Every structure is written in structure tokens, then in C-alpha cells.
Amino acid sequence: MYEESLRTPLLMKYPKEIKPGIKIDQMIQNLDFAPTLLDYANINPSQEIQGLSFRDIVNQNQSNWRDAIYYTYYEYPSVHMVKRHYGIRTDRYKLIHFYYDIDEWELYDLKKDPSEMNNLYSDPKHKSIQKSLHKKLTELRKYYGDSDSLNKFHINSYLSKMNN
């Protein structure tokens, strides 16, 4: 969930509609790609698709957009050996929860610490920010249908396969 893996460039070319040199600063997620491409193809996406079309953002016609993104990584143990984690990123802050065989939280101020080297989670000066991010994180997990019980289900399923 660190910036080096979270921020991925995307290049699009559609001269009929997209002006050259457009740069988007809004929080776009990979789950927005399919709805956007379907939108350009004039196809209505299925209700099950979680993402949003960012076509209006590319065309500079949309002012309101999400103020946070939810992220989850659950492929542990695996090749990368990165612990399971989920979190939320806003324009300024990032809250990450590592779970499964650990229970660790990280909080970063991306404006003051863009390299994410100073974990502020235990800093009492950031309790109100932490509380606000926890609330938003809970809302987004509910919105996307993620939960601790779902995590436990997948973990137990994985462990049973490994033990057989």
C-alpha cells in the first residue's frame, strides 16, 4: 500500500475525445478501468462492477469524486512475502492495517512525509485524524463488501488447502 506500488501511471489515447497532455490528480483505482472503457464504448456496466467511470474527469467535466481509496492485499504467504493488509488513502493521509499473523497499524502524513518513513499511529497528536480515518475505512470496507469475517474465511480456506 506504499506509494511506490499504489501510484501507477496510466496512458490513454482517444483523439476523438481526450485532449493531449491531460493529467489527472484524482484518486483513480484499477477497478475504475473497466467502467471507464465501457463508458467510452457506450456500454452500461453491470451492477456488480465496483468501480466508477472517470471519463468525465478526463474530459474535465467532473468536480466531485471520491475523497479516499480503499486498498487490500491478501496474498500472504506468497512469492513477495508481504503481510496481508488493507487500508485507506486520502489526499493527505494513509492508514494501513497489517493482519493475519500480526496486528499492526501504520499512519502517514503524505504531505509532510511523502516517503512514508515516520509512522504516526501511536502519536497522540494524530488521534483525531486516526479516528476519522478508521471511520472512513470502516465505511469503505462495508461499501466494498470486505470484513474481518470474510478475511478469516479466506485465511481458513487457504490454510486447509495447505494442510491437505
Predicted regions and their residues:
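Short Gly/Pro-enriched turn/cap motifs at secondary-structure boundaries
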Residues: 1-3, 76-79, 85, 98
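Substrate-binding rim/cap in mid-to-C-terminal beta-strand-loop elements of soluble/periplasmic
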Residues: 1-48, 52-64, 91
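A structure-centric signal for secondary-structure junctions around beta-strands
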Residues: 5-8, 51, 65, 82-83, ...
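Long, internal low-complexity/basic segments
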Residues: 7, 120-164
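A short aromatic-rich beta-strand->coil structural motif
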Residues: 10-11, 37, 89-125, 133, ...
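Active-site-proximal beta-strand/loop segments in catalytic clefts of secreted hydrolases
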Residues: 14-15, 73, 98
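WW-domain-binding short linear motifs
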Residues: 67-72
